[in-house]
């Protein structure tokens, strides 16, 4: 695995990455997950995104650097995880995934876990 790109900020550490990927996997099972940079952009534009997860080892990284700008406009937290392969596995697909979006659902069973991870991501951005 190549070293993460320095443009990938904020980068989650190993424990936070694992928590994020666990929530991504649960959200995928609950149909609360959108996979890919294009779908993540759509959720941001529609205002239904809780937070955005991006892969730091994406090559070239510029194909998803529009997302942090959009996140800051929409006031949505975002984070980079080290591996696109791990993000793809957590999303439940056999291919690498460079970006994912957890969507809003007030009746969700994993709402508390989503908010806990969201708070940790927000502290990274400060």
UniProtKB/Swiss-Prot annotation:
Keywords: mRNA processing, mRNA splicing, Nucleus, Ribonucleoprotein, Ribosome biogenesis, RNA-binding, rRNA processing, Spliceosome. It comes from the Eukaryota. Transmembrane segments: none annotated. Its main location: nucleus. It is found in: Nucleus, Nucleolus. One of its GO terms (biological process) is mRNA processing. PROSITE patterns: RIBOSOMAL_L7AE. One of its GO terms (cellular component) is nucleolus. CDD domains: SNU13. InterPro entries: eL8/uL1-like, H/ACA_rnp_Nhp2-like, Ribosomal_eL30-like_sf, Ribosomal_eL8-like_CS, Ribosomal_eL8/eL30/eS12/Gad45, Ribosomal_eL8/Nhp2. One of its GO terms (molecular function) is RNA binding. Belongs to the eukaryotic ribosomal protein eL8 family. Common component of the spliceosome and rRNA processing machinery. In association with the spliceosomal U4/U6.U5 tri-snRNP particle, required for splicing of pre-mRNA. In association with box C/D snoRNPs, required for processing of pre-ribosomal RNA (rRNA) and site-specific 2'-O-methylation of substrate RNAs. Essential for the accumulation and stability of U4 snRNA, U6 snRNA, and box C/D snoRNAs. Component of the U3 snoRNP particle. Binds to the C'/D and B/C motifs in U3 snoRNA. Component of the 25S U4/U6.U5 tri-snRNP particle, a subcomplex of the spliceosome. Binds to the 5' stem-loop of U4 snRNA. This is 13 kDa ribonucleoprotein-associated protein. The lineage of its organism: Eukaryota, Fungi, Dikarya, Ascomycota, Saccharomycotina. The gene is SNU13.
């Amino acid at each position: 695995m190549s070293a993460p790109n320095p443009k990938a900020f904020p980068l989650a550490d190993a424990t936070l990455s694992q928590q994020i990927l666990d929530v991504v996997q649960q959200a995928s099972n609950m149909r609360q997950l959108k996979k890919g940079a294009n779908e993540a952009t759509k959720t941001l534009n529609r205002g239904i995104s809780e937070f955005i997860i991006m892969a730091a080892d994406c090559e070239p990284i510029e194909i998803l650097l529009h997302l942090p700008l959009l996140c800051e406009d929409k006031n949505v937290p975002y984070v980079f995880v080290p591996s696109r392969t791990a993000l793809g596995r957590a999303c439940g697909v056999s291919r690498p995934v460079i970006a994912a979006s957890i969507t809003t659902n007030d009746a969700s069973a994993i709402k508390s876990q989503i908010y806990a991870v969201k708070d940790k991501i927000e502290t990274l951005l400060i």
